[in-house]
């Protein structure tokens, strides 16, 4: 139990740090806060990675410890449902309903598509 908890903690810390770096990169590249785009990017990339990890776990019988580190830990720390929720609420409070709905649908459908693409890509390797 302690070993597994440490694996999740280390993976989560690395995933959170990676998400922070993506946000910084988006801010520097776009010259604006990573609101919406940064969150969408990490959620889509994280869904792709988790889909691939799932495919490999089935095909290669990956050690459960690696799944805890990379899946629950890293992907869990890298992606962020809470930021998606708050960003949608901010858009709704501003009355920007089309952007809020587009962002929500794009995140959900894009996440499903990215997860499926990651799964298929990993199976093809």
Swiss-Prot record:
Classify the protein's membrane topology as the record does: Multi-pass membrane protein
Instruction: Give the transmembrane ranges.
Output: 6-26, 35-55, 66-86, 100-120
| Keyword field | Cell inner membrane, Cell membrane, Ion channel, Ion transport, Membrane, Metal-binding, Sodium, Transmembrane, Transmembrane helix, Transport
InterPro entries per the record?
A: FluC
Q: Look up the domain of life of the source.
A: Bacteria
Q: Biological process GO annotation list? A: cellular detoxification of fluoride; fluoride transmembrane transport
Q: Where in the cell is it found?
A: Cell inner membrane
Regulation of catalytic or functional activity: Na(+) is not transported, but it plays an essential structural role and its presence is essential for fluoride channel function.
Catalysed conversion reaction:
fluoride(in) = fluoride(out)
Q: Which GO terms describe its cellular component?
A: plasma membrane
Indicate where this protein is primarily found.
Answer: membrane
Q: Which residues bind Na(+)?
A: 76, 79
Gene Ontology molecular function, alphabetical: fluoride channel activity; fluoride transmembrane transporter activity; metal ion binding
Summary of the function given for this chain in its UniProt record: Fluoride-specific ion channel. Important for reducing fluoride concentration in the cell, thus reducing its toxicity.
The similarity comment for this entry is: Belongs to the fluoride channel Fluc/FEX (TC 1.A.43) family.
The cross-references to NCBIfam families, in alphabetical order and at most eight, read: crcB
- What is the protein named? Fluoride-specific ion channel FluC
Could you tell me which species this protein originates from? Gloeobacter violaceus (strain ATCC 29082 / PCC 7421)
Name of the gene encoding the protein in the UniProt record: fluC
């Amino acid at each position: 139990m302690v070993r597994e908890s440490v694996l999740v903690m280390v993976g989560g810390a690395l995933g959170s740090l990676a998400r922070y770096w993506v946000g910084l990169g988006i801010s520097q590249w776009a010259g604006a806060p990573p609101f919406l785009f940064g969150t969408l990017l990490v959620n889509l990339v994280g869904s792709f990675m988790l889909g691939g990890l799932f495919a490999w776990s089935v095909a290669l019988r990956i050690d459960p410890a690696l799944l805890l580190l990379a899946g629950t830990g890293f992907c869990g720390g890298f992606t962020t449902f809470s930021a998606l929720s708050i960003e949608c609420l901010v858009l709704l409070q501003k009355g920007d309903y089309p952007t809020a709905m587009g962002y929500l649908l794009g995140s959900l459908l894009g996440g499903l598509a990215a997860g499926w693409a990651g799964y298929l890509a990993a199976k093809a390797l």
